[in-house]
């Protein structure tokens, strides 16, 4: 009897899993569905770049990241969209964040040796390391930083497309549009159902198509709460993003810059060679979009991505943070317009662990979610671990970290760079110029 899996969502988790299952011939039929073609506008990874770095205070994530980075470097397709530009990270004024970074750096040196990182103990040393970049920058004299010259970024939208093409080559079937837009789970028994268990469900899409499957993987990113009651295990959060367009001459000046990461303010990527855009993202303020649901009393209000018309403006605090960052690090660009602004919606968990587990109320549904803003780097290898969870082979260490929690509430992380969580509907939006 043939076995079928339906993967709902063609972002990082969904595509990586589709490729892994197809390579291993774990299912006879693999169907991946989404409302939009890859890269979907609803995917957090639909962007020009995402950071790829190994620093984690948790050793198991660090090892997972190093494994992924080897694949970024050596995979024939993915290496073409991976850029190892290095990352300059300033030391936070927040003691919890500073402690997190200290532990992460110690872990990396433990695994790779002291040469893995370069410590810069003053603004003078930072300028000496990057003389052309920071010659006019008013850096604080006591500013300290750490450089990882082996970190980098990948073109995230292009990476998703490459994985889709790989999956197609391996025989994965893709369905987009209304026939691929998840609507709900239904109990709709097919002739192949033996026990007719009411907890064995099928997928119904927007146009009424019903997909029967032995196994379903729900990998819908920030939209999970719209389809499934997770009892607040995950929360959709919006992160502000903007860009600066460089001229050809400016591109020559900034093309060799590292990622500059200031956890107290914002961060910036080198200009992408094709578009010559520098991407900026602010830290400190995150946004939720709370809506009422018909879930149980404990989940009456959940956050899902804002579904109204997208705003061409940004929250006021985000612009303030980005401008402060530019004034400090890239003053020659400080008066430039912020363009292509958007909110990048992620699926966040309180402890930053992913949610990769069987959904308790169903017999045949698994979930891969909770990217928490750091999952993209694992695009080359996370599918292997999701597949292991589906097939029952995942290590106990990862099973415990990624389990579906109900009674045991996860511990909130104090090191996160979040000063305030603001409801999207209450945020003050403004135009940059």
Curated annotation (Swiss-Prot):
In this protein, the residues bearing a glycan are: 24, 119, 188, 229
Q: What is its EC number?
A: 1.5.3.18
Q: Which domain of life is it from?
A: Eukaryota
Q: What are the GO BP annotations of this UniProt entry? A: L-lysine catabolic process
- What does the entry list under GO cellular component? cytosol; extracellular region; nucleus
Give the principal location in a single coarse category: secreted
Matching SUPFAM superfamilies: FAD/NAD(P)-binding domain
The region annotated as signal peptide is 1-18
Quaternary structure per UniProt? Monomer.
Which family does the record claim for this protein? Answer: Belongs to the MSOX/MTOX family.
What is the official name of this protein in its record?
A: L-saccharopine oxidase
Source organism (scientific name): Schizosaccharomyces pombe (strain 972 / ATCC 24843)
Q: What is the lineage of its organism?
A: Eukaryota, Fungi, Dikarya, Ascomycota, Taphrinomycotina
Q: Which gene encodes it?
A: fap2
């Amino acid at each position: 009897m043939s076995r079928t899996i339906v993967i709902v969502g063609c972002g990082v988790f969904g595509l990586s899993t589709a490729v892994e299952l197809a390579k291993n011939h774990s299912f006879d039929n693999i169907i991946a569905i989404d409302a939009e073609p890859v890269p979907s506008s609803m995917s957090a990874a639909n962007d020009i770049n995402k950071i790829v770095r190994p620093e984690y205070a948790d050793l198991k994530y660090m090892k997972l990241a190093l494994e992924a980075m080897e694949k970024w470097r050596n995979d024939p397709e993915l290496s073409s969209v991976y850029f190892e530009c290095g990352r300059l990270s300033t030391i936070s004024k927040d003691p919890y964040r500073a402690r997190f970074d200290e532990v992460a750096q110690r872990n990396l040196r433990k695994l790779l040796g002291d040469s893995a990182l370069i410590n810069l103990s003053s603004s003078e040393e930072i300028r000496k390391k990057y003389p052309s970049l920071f010659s006019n920058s008013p850096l604080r004299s006591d500013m300290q930083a750490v450089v990882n010259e082996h970190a980098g970024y990948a073109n995230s939208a292009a990476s998703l497309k490459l994985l889709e093409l790989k999956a197609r080559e391996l025989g994965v079937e893709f369905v987009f549009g209304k026939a691929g837009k998840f609507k709900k789970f239904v109990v709709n028994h097919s002739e192949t159902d033996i026990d007719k268990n009411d907890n064995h469900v099928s997928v119904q899409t927007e146009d009424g198509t019903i997909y029967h499957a032995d196994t379903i993987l729900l990998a819908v990113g920030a939209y999970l709460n719209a389809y499934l009651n997770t009892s607040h295990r995950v929360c959709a959060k919006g992160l502000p993003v903007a860009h600066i367009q460089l001229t050809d001459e400016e591109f020559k000046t900034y093309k060799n810059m590292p990622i500059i990461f200031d956890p107290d303010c914002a961060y910036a990527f080198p200009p992408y060679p094709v578009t010559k855009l520098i991407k900026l993202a602010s830290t400190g303020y995150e946004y939720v979009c709370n809506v009422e649901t018909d879930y149980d009393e404990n989940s009456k209000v959940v956050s899902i991505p804002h579904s109204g018309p997208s705003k061409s403006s940004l929250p006021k605090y985000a612009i303030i943070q980005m401008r402060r960052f530019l004034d400090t690090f890239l003053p020659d660009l400080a008066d430039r317009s912020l363009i292509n602004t958007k909110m990048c919606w992620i699926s966040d968990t309180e402890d930053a662990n992913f949610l990769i587990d069987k959904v308790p109320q169903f017999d045949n549904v698994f979930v891969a979610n909770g990217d928490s803003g750091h999952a993209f780097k694992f695009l080359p290898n996370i599918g292997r671990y999701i597949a292991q969870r589906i097939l029952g082979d995942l290590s106990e260490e990862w099973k415990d970290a990624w389990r579906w929690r109900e009674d045991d509430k996860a511990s909130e992380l104090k090191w996160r760079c979040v000063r305030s969580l603001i409801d999207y509907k209450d945020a003050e939006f403004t135009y940059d110029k």
